[in-house]
Curated annotation (Swiss-Prot):
Gene Ontology CC annotations of this record: cytosol
Keyword Cytoplasm recorded: yes
InterPro entries named in the record: Ribosome_recyc_fac, Ribosome_recyc_fac_dom, RRF_sf
UniProt keyword terms in alphabetical order: Cytoplasm, Protein biosynthesis
Name of the molecule in the record: Ribosome-recycling factor
Function: Responsible for the release of ribosomes from messenger RNA at the termination of protein biosynthesis. May increase the efficiency of translation by recycling ribosomes from one round of translation to another.
One Gene Ontology molecular-function label: ribosomal large subunit binding
The family this protein is said to belong to: Belongs to the RRF family.
Gene that this sequence comes from: frr
GO biological process, one term: cytoplasmic translational termination
PANTHER family: MITOCHONDRIAL RIBOSOME RECYCLING FACTOR PSEUDO 1, RIBOSOME RECYCLING FACTOR
Amino acid sequence: MINDLKKDSEQRMQKTLESLEQGFAKVRTGRAHPSILNGVMVPYYGSDVPLNQVANVGIEDSRTLVVQPFERTMVSAIDKAIRESDLGLNPITADSIRVPLPALTEETRRDMQKVARSEAENAKVAIRNIRRDVLGDLKSLLKDKEISEDDERRAGDDIQKITDKYVAEVDKRLAAKEAELMKV
């Protein structure tokens, strides 16, 4: 029972780390990466769909993405969706869509760093909330006399160690992202 709680908490914390990585992927660094356009939604036959479902996104060079729509009729809709996204990108349209990424200014890098820190802080809060939920479950098991006080205390210490491990991992990933952002 206690082991199930530990495994469940560890799985939930791992999902939080995966979510953090997805959040970090949206933070633009100086280099082109297809995941920059992951959040762009394109109108397609009456509903909004992710860009990667209507086009291939590739890298032309270190500062340029290439978007090749599966259907030629989608070029203008994709162009418009990229322009209207909050990414500040201006695509160049021909048969395919080229998306040059402007060089990041120092100010933009600082703003991106703030966004990355915010994502990391949200991940830490989520991890701590998972810990709180599991500790609450342990307390209710103790109250129902399904586990002893010693078991509850030992399991609580184990959960704290797991939490510390994942919070340290969030800090490590944030430091790596900040270093990547500040690299010119």
